[in-house]
Design a protein with these regions (language model features):
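Short, hydrophobic beta-strand segments
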Residues: 2-10, 60-66
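N-terminal first-folded block
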Residues: 6-44
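Short loop/turn motifs enriched for small/polar and acidic residues
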Residues: 9, 43-47, 99-103
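Macromolecular interaction modules
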Residues: 20-23, 67, 106, 123-125
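Histidine-centered catalytic/metal-coordination loop motif
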Residues: 32-35, 41-65
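Mid-chain, well-packed structural core segment of small domains
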Residues: 53-93
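C-terminal structural segments of small proteins and small subunits
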Residues: 87-109
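Short, low-complexity, polybasic intrinsically disordered segments
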Residues: 109-125
Length: 125
């Protein structure tokens, strides 16, 4: 955890390559101090088919899913940090946005948590 899922119009890659966008989001999340570097996961999905408002031709939105426990101020600071890092790289973009959603630790499961040897339920086992 966390997961940063980026959705964007494919024409965004004419402004910056996917690798630059991915690395910028990863580095910003890492520098926030909210997550262990090895826990951060960033991926990008681009779209050729989409409809935007008149005169608008590009978008990028980041959906962040993080484990519960951060304050509203920390989540807002994370969104602001990532958008501030991306904005200069995507100066011509029509829409640039992000939201942070939390999930409950009690309902979270991963491969480590189902390992019978992991008696402490350590999600990093």
């Amino acid at each position: 955890m966390p997961h940063f899922v980026i959705e964007c119009s494919s024409n965004v890659f004419a402004m910056q390559p996917a690798a630059i966008i991915l690395n910028t989001v990863y580095d910003a999340a890492d520098s926030s101090g909210l997550f262990a570097p090895n826990d951060i996961k960033v991926r990008i999905n681009s779209y050729d088919n989409y409809k935007l408002g008149e005169g608008k031709n590009s978008f990028l939105h980041i959906y962040a899913s993080i484990m519960e426990g951060r304050t509203t101020a920390q989540k807002a600071a994370l969104s602001n940090l990532i958008i501030e890092r991306l904005a200069p790289l995507l100066a011509g973009i029509s829409f640039l946005s992000m939201n942070v959603s939390e999930f409950e630790e009690a309902t979270y499961c991963n491969k480590s948590l189902i390992n019978p040897l992991n008696t402490d339920r350590n999600r990093h086992f």
